Amino acid sequence: MNTATLSIVIPAYNSPNWITQCLSHLASALSNAGIPESQVIVVDDGSTDNTGDEAESFTGLNLTVLRQSNLGRFKARENGLALCTGTHVLFLDTRVFLGKDSLKFVLPFLQHPETSLWTADVQANTTGNPIARFWRAIENIFWRRYMNNPRTTSFGLEDFDYYPKGTTALIAPVELIREAISQFVPTVGDWRKVNDDTALLRFAAERTRINISPEYTCTYNARTNLRAFLKHANHRGSVLIDGYLRSGTRLNIPIWSVLILAPFGLYVAFSNLLLALIALAVIPLSVFVLVLSLGVRVKDALVLASLFWPFSIYYLLGMYWGLWLKFGRRNTSSEQL
């Protein structure tokens, strides 16, 4: 008999339409797993709309809505975690829809220590959303060790940087995550800019292996317009610095290389306009050919090449902003703590 019990924590900010759909998919997954009474905690992270009210009006779940000022996802999860009564916690986000049989698959594993920690196989919803194809292409490139051969497997610190992972749809023992959060030291001055995924998962991977399977899946609904995409790209650039600009990570040297060489490339472009115009055309074409050779779908590769320059500019600006937050404003203010 499975002795594992589940609490679900969902940070929510200005997402009244998404939260209802997220909860609906969660209810289906809980029902199919035979645990419909599991504790669900929605943390309204200072929404300026009716997100919290929409969550409270949802029926069919053992649901509590916790309201806080806008402190970001990390603090929302921490405050939600404090209310958890289950042996394990599932972190969800409002744009993430859990697969209907995902919990049914993973639940029997949770009672065994070596299979008690799971990260989801996240599928991007590309229907009518070319921007989602961009992110899927990026994931297929960086996590191709798994993406080219999805299977039930696990990884540890030795191959941590080669597998897709995140705290979205993460299932973990409550006490492990509480310990990870208590040991977490932010490297930026704004909790809303904190990249909790990498630090928390590295902490967990030091103690147990992280499991992943195409049977434990969820769907991510990416932003659908260019403005939101560029804003998100800028944010991802800043949290990349927080999560991976440290010795021992796979991306540490490549990140420093980009940060150092980018100003030089800009100088060359301004010094030789013809060369800059050639680069504007040739580099995206080269990217298209390269990612095709890495197994990326043709349509995804086309979107990646088309958005290469706007993404690169906003992402790079985010990286420099993250560098400033990491080294120029290291102290987190008392108001944010």
Language model: regions and residue ranges:
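Short, well-formed alpha-helical segments that are part of the catalytic scaffolds
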Residues: S15-S31
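Glycine-rich, basic loop-to-helix element that forms the pyrophosphate-binding segment
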Residues: Q68-C84, F105
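Catalytic donor/gating beta->alpha subdomain of glycosyltransferases that bind UDP-sugars
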Residues: Q183-S247
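Active-site-adjacent helix/loop segment of glycosyltransferases
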Residues: T219-F311, L317-W321, L337
